[in-house]
Amino acid sequence: MTGLIGRFGIAAMLLAGTAAARAQISGDVVRVGVLNDTAGVFQDTNGPGSVITARLAAEDFAGGGRGIRVEIVQGDHQNKADIGSAIARRWLDVEGVDAIVDVPNSAVGLAVNTVARDSRMALLASSTATSDLTGRACSPNTVQWVTDSYAIGRTAARAMMERGGQSWFFLTVDYALGHAIQRDAGEFIEANGGRVMGAARHPLGATDFSSLLLQAQASRANVIGLANASPDSGNAIKQAAEFGLTRNQRLVAFLMFVNDVHAIGLQAAQGLLLMEAFYWDMNDETRAFSRRFQERMGRPPSTNQAGVYSATLAYLRAVAASGTDDARQAIPAMKRAPFQDPLFGETYIRQDGRTVHAMHLFEVKRPEESRGPWDYYRLVQTVPGEQAFRPLAEGGCPLLR
């Protein structure tokens, strides 16, 4: 098992002054490693599609006007922290990878964060969702893109409580992501007068949720919070609809993507509330990008795949601006000033590594409301980044001491 399953070279046109421009680029090439799950539970929301969006970012970077060559490599962490950290260590020590991007699965993300912390390698954690990554585990070499458990947990909980959902039962995937979502959402619920009636845990990749859903039903909670991700959330939603739970209890998906809605269908998913930082049909820019992706992948991108594009492009531009691919200089360059991200809008990166941008609350459309395939969301509310993400002073990031 090598973990390296693909290598794609993307060379920019050589320009005058290339040698000088690349003087601080290690090995005369910037290598970006897409580390994700290529054949397991996250292959649809990440997998090969994340490699495509990383390549699109490299193409759009086009050498940064300085002839900087970019190479994209891919590794499969198999949702195992030891495998993910071993790939990261080999990429750092042997293969000259300068930045790792993507990394769905919070346990793997935290392990890779440890490898990158004291190195020259950047971690662009566009799919690692635990808020601990920019809290107690923050690193000067790590940037967390897209979302985190605090943002999705609290904004979704607030929206549901405003709609009368005062009592909650959690279905929680039993690893770092699920624990963090339940913690962050539960703290908000109880601090605002709600009650957590109970929780039931399940392994990653569970297929039978019947006993857990019966526990949720017996709790008589107003809301069943799905503290998990695809495909677990999709399986739970389908089975909840089959059992008739949605007649008396409301479901909230904290971390679910348009791919999951497509897989389970509007009949089962209709009325579901969920938080996303990106939706392919949000505006002209997201639609244009999604058309490019769809030409290669046959469907629109997920939020995680969009995050790989934006994080990779921002990193490459920081490399060009700082003149080096050393994370200890490139990451500070990323944090230097706010910027207009093509997919996520007005964006800035805080000192703890948290990327701040707007988050969006969507409701899944009824079948008769959809205009066709992938037209699944109705925008309910846009939450400014300053309200969605945890305040800088509250995360406990050691970098701020």
Predicted feature descriptions by range:
Residues 2-4, 8, 21-401:
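Extracytosolic ligand-binding ectodomains
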Residues 4, 14-15:
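Leucine-biased recognition of intrinsically disordered, low-complexity hydrophobic segments
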Residues 16-20:
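N-terminal signal peptide c-region/cleavage motif recognized by signal peptidases
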